[in-house]
Amino acid sequence: MMGKYLWALVYVTVMILIIVVEVESSLHRVGGGRYTWNSDVNFSDWANHQRFYSGDWLYFGFNRTRHNILQVNKSSYEQCVDNDYIFNITRGGRDVFQLLEPKPYYFICGRGYCLKGMKLAITVLPQPPPSAPTNFTSTTTPLIPPNAITAAILIFAFKALLL
């Protein structure tokens, strides 16, 4: 019996999160693919075709026995200095890094690979303001108003709690 209540509570929580929470961040696969943190990718070209916002995530896929990912300052990035890094992102070869602030970020691969072009510089922008809702002038009304759908979901979840 208690299991039913637990599932109902989980269901209600998930529904509320889906309704209320709006995810604004994106995942960027560095280099454009699954395992593209390697010396065959032009990271400057890739970054120039991306737009990064605070809250976004970078995904680095690579062979961890050969490569690593170090967050560095601009000077270390330009000179490929890997012993004065800010943060070592390397964990398991499929690693993520969240871009928390709007600012420039610099990443390099140590072990001599930075000199072969394995480095990435990006500029992170502040989150854009939410877009204004589009004002549609329609003569028809939806069959089910959005608030009715939300109410139906919550009523169903509440009834499930009572069962």
Curated annotation (Swiss-Prot):
GO cellular component, one term: plasma membrane
Topology term for the membrane: Lipid-anchor; GPI-anchor
Keyword check for Cell membrane: yes
PROSITE patterns per record: PHYTOCYANIN (PS51485)
Disulfide bonds: C80-C114
Residues that carry a glycan: N42, N63, N73, N88, N135
Signal peptide location: 1-25
Removed propeptide positions: 139-163
Domain of life where this protein originates: Eukaryota
Ranges of residues in domain Phytocyanin: 26-126
Keywords per UniProt: Cell membrane, Disulfide bond, Glycoprotein, GPI-anchor, Lipoprotein, Membrane, Signal
Cellular localisation: Cell membrane
UniProt cross-references to Gene3D superfamilies, sorted A to Z: Cupredoxins - blue copper proteins
GO molecular function, one term: electron transfer activity
Chain segments annotated as coiled-coil in the UniProt record: none
Positions of GPI-anchor amidated serine lipidation: S138
Job of this protein: May act as a carbohydrate transporter.
Protein family (similarity comment): Belongs to the early nodulin-like (ENODL) family.
Protein name in UniProt: Early nodulin-like protein 20
